[in-house]
């Protein structure tokens, strides 16, 4: 069935009745190109608007890291030296809130001299590769909006000294924007409103960009995913990699201790017994202020979007149906 024949999208058919033949040809072509399967989640109410039961989650804390640091680091360096670790930089955003009309990673954060956000992140990664004596494959996720500018920026700056053969770009997939009933928003008489498919879609975007074969050929078993925003983070951190391996986990998350109960940061926890994240606006006051016997916050492990995943596990769950995390956008409207 054509999308415009769906009862829930009947206004599209009404629009087509008003369009010119040329407009309809363009609109039909566009509608046939888009994957609308995401709408099934919305129509079936498969979203995370209603959360499960939260509970605190333990983490490897500083005292244990200090006690077992040498062990963790050696395990991590071994994995890196064996070519088993890759990194994915999520850099699809623009620097609009920073006053930039270009990719966020191109922000100059230098004081005495020019120092770009992308540059500092590459330096952080090279701190590790210099110690390990091998390069870590880096995959950079861009967006339709900033892909050309991002790739040109890296070319202009000679990849900040990182080997070009170890850097690959891929574009984040887009999904149709819709309302809470799954009705599609339109940008114009011929264009569907589209939005990025979220942080959770990075691996499927990689796969659909044909990069799974590259991961396989390189023998990568662990992927460190991190966001462009944090210029202080350690990338492919041997201690982080080693701790995850030592505990036999399929994934790991770097966290920072919350400074105060009302700090606006999501926290790592469990939800219905499974590891999860509760955003700060989803936490009750009771959750936010609950403390352990030693005075630490029970929900005190703030997430910084720096994760380590088993590549094998990612493949296993790549086609799994996940609930949609709804993000409201004020600038979306239908032209009908």
Where are these regions (language model features)?
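N-terminal glycine-rich phosphate-binding loop and ensuing alpha1 helix
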Residues: 2-167, 176, 185-203, 212-213, ...
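Generic alpha-helix signal with a bias toward terminal, lower-confidence helices
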Residues: 43, 106, 110, 118-121, ...
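Fold-independent oxyanion-binding glycine-rich loops
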Residues: 92, 143-144, 172-173, 208-209, ...
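Conserved beta-loop-beta/alpha segment of the NTase-like Rossmann-fold superfamily
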Residues: 159-160, 164-263
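Catalytic core of tubulin tyrosine ligase-like
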Residues: 215, 219-224, 232-236, 241-334
């Amino acid at each position: 069935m054509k999308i415009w024949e769906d009862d829930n999208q009947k206004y599209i058919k009404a629009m087509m009745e008003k369009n010119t033949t040329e407009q309809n040809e363009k609109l039909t072509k566009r509608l046939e190109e888009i994957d609308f399967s995401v709408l099934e989640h919305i129509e079936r109410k498969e979203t995370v608007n209603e959360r499960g039961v939260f509970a605190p989650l333990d983490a490897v804390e500083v005292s244990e890291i200090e006690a077992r640091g040498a062990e963790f680091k050696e395990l991590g360096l071994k994995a890196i030296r064996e070519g088993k670790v890759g990194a994915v930089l999520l850099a699809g955003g623009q620097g609009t809130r920073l006053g930039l009309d270009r990719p966020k990673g191109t922000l100059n954060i230098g004081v005495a001299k020019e120092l770009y956000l992308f540059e500092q992140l590459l330096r952080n990664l090279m701190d590790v590769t210099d110690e390990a004596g091998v390069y870590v494959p880096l995959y950079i996720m861009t967006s339709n909006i900033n892909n050309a500018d991002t790739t040109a920026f890296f070319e202009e700056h000679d990849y900040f000294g990182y080997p070009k053969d170890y850097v690959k770009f891929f574009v984040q997939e887009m999904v149709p924007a819709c309302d809470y009933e799954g009705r599609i928003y339109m940008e114009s008489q011929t264009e569907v409103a589209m939005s990025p498919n979220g942080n959770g879609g990075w691996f499927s975007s990689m796969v659909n960009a044909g990069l799974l074969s590259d991961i396989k050929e390189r023998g990568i078993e662990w992927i460190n995913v991190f966001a462009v925003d944090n210029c202080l983070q350690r990338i492919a951190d041997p201690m982080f990699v080693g701790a995850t391996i030592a505990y036999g986990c399929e994934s790991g998350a770097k966290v920072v201790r919350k400074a105060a109960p009302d700090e606006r940061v999501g926290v790592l926890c469990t939800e219905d017994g499974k590891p999860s994240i509760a955003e700060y606006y989803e936490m009750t006051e009771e959750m936010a202020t609950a403390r352990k016997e030693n005075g630490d916050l029970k929900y005190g492990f703030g997430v910084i979007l720096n994760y380590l995943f088993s590549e094998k596990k990612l493949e296993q769950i790549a086609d799994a149906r996940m609930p949609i995390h709804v993000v409201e956008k004020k600038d979306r409207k239908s032209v009908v």
